[in-house]
Amino acid sequence: MFSIPVSSKTVRLILVSLLLITLINILAAFQRSTLSSWFPSSRHIINKFTDLRLALSSQESVLRDEEGEIYSLVGYHHDFDSNLVVVQKQYLLEKTPNEDTTEHFWNFLQSNFETKSEYDLNLIDGYNYKKLIKHLNEQNELQLSHSFVEQYKMENQFIQSFQNFFVQLIDTIEDCKPDLDPINNDNHYPNGDKIVKYYELRNKIPSENMKQFNIERLIHRNGRIPIYGGHLREQYKDELIRNKEFLSMYLTLSDSEISALKKSHTKFLETMMENWPENLFKFNKFNNFMKGDGIVYLGGGKYNQLVLLSIKILRENGSRLPVEVIIPYKNDYDIQFCDRVLPTLNGKCKLMTDYLPQTFVDKISGFQLKNIALLISSFERILYLDADNIPIRNPDVLFTNAPFTTKHLVVWPDLWRRSTSPHYYTIAGIEVDPNFKVRNSYVDGDERGKYTDSMYYSYHDCKGSIPEASSETGQLLINKKIHFQTLILAMYYNYYGPDYYYPLFSQGAAGEGDKETFIAAAHKLDLPYYQVGEFNREFGPINDNTRKHEFYGMGQYDPIIDYYMSTITTTQKDTKKKINYNSPLPEKYAANDEDDTCSNYDFHLFQSSSLFFLHANWPKYYIEKLFLYSYDEDRGPVTNDGDKRRLYGNELKKELGGYDFELNIMKNLHWCFCEEPLIDLIGIPVVGSKTRTDVCIAIKNHIEFLEIS
């Protein structure tokens, strides 16, 4: 590690000279590179490095942006294989940079760049916490300069305005109720035999051979789409192209049913609110509604233990943005968690039912909770995280860079292909041209993506359709100002989801629920959004029978890096040589999910993708259930046979370049529930009980196992 002794002018001069030589080499290579950066701020990256050179020459250790704010430069991402380099501005709260930060960037520059003739150098913005602190100070001054009575009165007016908002919203939704019976039943999936026959004819399989065929690869529960069908990364060869004809075979609606749903949908679009009610801004003087950025969780009851773990790691990663935990019901409100623990982590609870009319509280169903949480949360721009979602890196930087700054809604993919029924597009009035292919969701080399006959076009590769893949909304970035109507239309979808829209969006596929409502609403309203392209990656032990990875957790990737790699060929039109970040293609593909001769688990869509979130959803970190009862399904850190194992195999550690994130999770679990001061939460064994002691011993044992495995 380099440092510059203040007392030694000679040594300082030598080191500065060496750094200048390195910078000159970097700039020369940068100019030789045929690629200029796509980040708006990095158009001036040469000037920024010149600024750094001048700063160091004049014994200055900081840089200033156009507004005079102090920042340093730190490494954000460096992939040695593709030689993609991303440097981040780090805004400083003090006038001098942290010594570790300075040395970090020094070492970043002193890497092997000078030996590279070409590399792709990019600059991104960091999060300027000074603006956040300024806002907090202004808010505190505002509260100190007004009486309690005035603040209390205005907050009550704000809450009443929110309740009125929901009254109007629910009245509008109920006024547009579809005039037909529910469609989410077996009667609307009558084509099981027809689908099997279709598969037999398409693949020219003799009827005798079909007797050995696993029907569950085509249908489940009479005639629904396979739960785990259409694995996007594995591209199983036996799977049929999901063209319009094939997708239309599952959920079956009559003309009158389609007409009734279309009438309801059209009426809601014509009567839905266009903007937030003015009263919410009239009475938000003393609160943070629609002000700034923040991170939102949906917690309450047993979920609080999951939220606490996630927030603890969030803060450990360096995030400073405020956190809100939305608690659905009063019975779920944990005083210990909300009033004592969360404030120490710059977080607070918000009780959902305070903002809802009582008549609506009794009607809330589980799949509507996320939508409501997004609406009532304080912030204008939100990173929403499920309680069981754990950030691997500091997510604050996502707020200050594309794609979020340009698209205002970022969604991540599920493991599976999209299974949305063509009927949805008819009902929503979205024109899809099945004869016009605008993208190819099959990787190069897959014959299913090469057809020129439109009858073989994947429906969700066609003009007007929502692109692949299906959505996984354990994490979601949304600007509530720009996407207000997205949330309102999604609320309509979720209100009538279980009876109508969930089967239209998923047709029985894995995770059927609210997950498709946000992207569908934005798509219908023609509002901007970005889908992360890198495959969702399952982590877990390898199944002894299928040799495939179990789904213990899902890994999601950095949207900043993803956006760059996915858009580079369209944004760099003037370069002589375009850098292609697509990964080399697999040599072969498995026939189906039971084929143990081949797996493309290590295949990434892009060469330089960076893992960002771990959605630890099965098993969740309910510590008693996980460590003492193996999650009831032999999914714990110790198998039913007594063998210790990593929950996410060695693949998670490999994906993170050797960083043992599972070990870090376990150490934080121990900190949360086994170290002083011991915390009692709903769903956690009582402090001092034998069960609590046994859980902590099991966590400690797993930590020791991970440290040597």
Swiss-Prot record:
Point out the gene that encodes the protein: MNN24
GO molecular function, one example?
alpha-1,2-mannosyltransferase activity
The top of its lineage is: Eukaryota, Fungi, Dikarya, Ascomycota, Saccharomycotina
Functionally, this protein is described as follows: Alpha-1,2-mannosyltransferase required for cell wall integrity. Responsible for addition of the first alpha-1,2-linked mannose to form the branches on the mannan backbone of oligosaccharides. Addition of alpha-1,2-mannose is required for stabilization of the alpha-1,6-mannose backbone and hence regulates mannan fibril length; and is important for both immune recognition and virulence.
Keyword Cytoplasm attached: no
Query: Which PANTHER family does this entry report, sorted A to Z?
Result: ALPHA-1,2-MANNOSYLTRANSFERASE MNN2
- Topological domains (Extracellular): residue ranges? 31-709
Q: Which family does it belong to?
A: Belongs to the MNN1/MNT family.
Main subcellular localisation: Golgi
Main enzyme class:
transferase
Task: Please identify the protein, giving its name as recorded.
Answer: Alpha-1,2-mannosyltransferase MNN24
Give the pathway. Answer: Protein modification; protein glycosylation
Spell out where the chain is glycosylated: 317
The places in or outside the cell where this protein is found are: Golgi apparatus membrane
Under Enzyme Commission nomenclature, its number is 2.4.1.-
